[in-house]
C-alpha cells in the first residue's frame, strides 16, 4: 500500500469517527496527529475528503493493519499484534473516560436506563472494543426440549492462540498490573502480548450496596448487551448477603437487565474466581421464561413468594415487592443449603473443612416484583465422576466438558469452536451408506461415534436438507442432559422427594 493509500485510510478512519460522534470537527487535526504518532508517521500527503459507508471500523482498520504489516510497524503479522495496534488506533480517537461517564448518566436521567445502556453498547461496538466482525462468526440456534427452547451458540469469536505471541510472552517479566482482566486499571491500558490492549475500553461507575462497582460490556458478547459488573476492588468471588443486596439494587437501577453471579467454588464456578463480578444484560434467557411448577411459603418471610422452577437444574425462585425482605429470604435459603446434607441424594456439604454447597444467584424484575433465582450447586467429586458429580458426565464430554457457569445455567450453551467443523464432518458421515467407516476416517469426530450412530438409528430419513437441523436439535437434547447432570436434585420421583426434604428445612 502506497503513502497516498495510507493517507486515504487514515482520513477514512477520521471520517468514520466523526460520523459516529467519537470526535467533533474541532478534534480532527489533533486526532489525525495522534493516529500519525501511533503509526510512526511524520506527515501525510493531503487527500480530498473521503466518503465512508461503514457501520463499524474494522474494514478501515484492516487496511491500515495491512499497511502496518508491509511497513514494519508490526512485530509479526498475527492476530495478537494486529489487535494491539488497532486498539491503540481506536484509543487515539476517544475522549477522556469522564466524558463517556458524563454522557451516560445525562442520558440515564433524561431518557432512562434502557436508552443509556443501549447507546453505551452501540458505543462499545463502534470503538471496536466489541469486535462485531468476530462476533458475527458465532453460530446460534434454539432447540426444543421439555424445559422450553434452550439456546445454543458455537463460539467462533475468540481468536486461536498465537504461537509467536506465546513464545514472546515467555521472555516477558512477570507483571501483576493490571492484576486481572476485570480490574478497573485496564481502562486505557496499552496491553502486552499476554494481556489485551484496552485503550478503547470505557466503564461506567455504579454504586451497589454503598460500594463502588463498575459496568462494561463483554468483548465476546454471547447475548444482547452482555454486561460485566465488577467490583472496584480486586477481591475474590464470594456469595454472601451483600451479593443479594447488590444484585437486587442493580435491578432497581437497571430494571430492563437481569444480573447474576457465578458460584464461588471451583468446578461449579466461572473461569474467573479471583475478582468479584456479575454478568447481566438485556436478554430473556430460557430459565427466566420457565414457570414455577410448585410454590411454597417460608414462614419467616410471609411477603415472599417462593417456588421450584421447572428446570433441569435445581432452582428455588423467590419473588417480592420488598427488596430488603427478599435479601433476607435469599440469605436464609443460601445458609440452609450451605449446611444441608442428604445421603440418599448423594449430597454432602463438607469434606472435612472443605465446603461443597453453594449457589448461582440470578436477579431480575418481573413487572413491579423483584425476583431471585437461587440455583443450588455442589462441587463434590468421586472416583466415578472425577470432574464433578454434579457436572457434565463422561458420556457428554464429546459436546462439552467445561464448567457449567452462569450463562449455561440460565439455558444458553456456549460450545467450543471445534464443533462447527465436527458437525460438518458428522453430517457427511450420517449421509453416507457406512457412517462408521467415514467416522473412522476423521480422528476429530471419533469421540462422537456412539452419539452419531444413535442419531442415525432414530432418524431413518436423513438427507442434505435436514441433517444439520437434526444434528443441532440433538445437541440441544445433549445440553438439556448436561444441565440435568449439574442439577443436585434429579428430575425423578426420588429427586422431587429429596428437593421437598430440603424445602421443609426452610421452615424449621
Curated annotation (Swiss-Prot):
Domain of life (superkingdom): Bacteria
InterPro entries xref list: GalP_uridyl_Trfase_II, GalP_uridyl_Trfase_II_CS, GalP_Utransf_C, GalP_Utransf_N
Pathway(s) this gene product operates in, as recorded in its UniProt entry: Carbohydrate metabolism; galactose metabolism
Pfam families per UniProt: GalP_UDP_tr_C, GalP_UDP_transf
Molecular function, one GO term: UDP-glucose:hexose-1-phosphate uridylyltransferase activity
One GO cellular component term: cytoplasm
EC number(s) per entry: 2.7.7.12
Keywords, alphabetical: Carbohydrate metabolism, Cytoplasm, Galactose metabolism, Nucleotidyltransferase, Transferase
Predominant cellular place of this UniProt entry's protein: cytoplasm
BP terms from Gene Ontology: galactose metabolic process
Compartment(s) of residence: Cytoplasm
Catalytic function, reaction form: alpha-D-galactose 1-phosphate + UDP-alpha-D-glucose = alpha-D-glucose 1-phosphate + UDP-alpha-D-galactose
PANTHER family: DUF4922 DOMAIN-CONTAINING PROTEIN, GALACTOSE-1-PHOSPHATE URIDYLYLTRANSFERASE
Family of the protein in this entry: Belongs to the galactose-1-phosphate uridylyltransferase type 2 family.
Identification of the protein by name: Galactose-1-phosphate uridylyltransferase
